[in-house]
Amino acid sequence: MSEKIKVLFVCLGNICRSPTAEGVFRTMVAKSGWQDMFHIDSAGTAAYYVGEPPDRRAQKQAKARGYDLSKLRARFISPQDFKKFDYVLVMDKHNFAEMEKVQKYCKDATAKLQLFLDYHPDKKGQEVPDPYSG
């Protein structure tokens, strides 16, 4: 098999939006039988919750929809992620701007940095609201 497609989802604390996106995407990929084709992860632009599981409310809502986030743990973004991943998908414009700053510290960065909703035909350029802080 050829090289895996590597996708990183990013939000502020990595406890609500990005782990939810990771969990949903993992499930969709697995249901399609493509799990061997992808490496999927999530991270935060702030190190508030490193090592902690997703927020209990995010887990509850995900579980109600058939997604399990319980094994995920928050981590802090690294400049090296821009070499490791093909796509870095960010939930909002503030964190996108932070990621642009981080990307500058990664020599030979290859990842494509985009807003997550740029992949939705009707929501290009829009943000995923932060349910944790309103």
Regions found by a protein language model. Give the residues of each.
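Conserved active-site segments centered on acidic
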Residues: 2-84
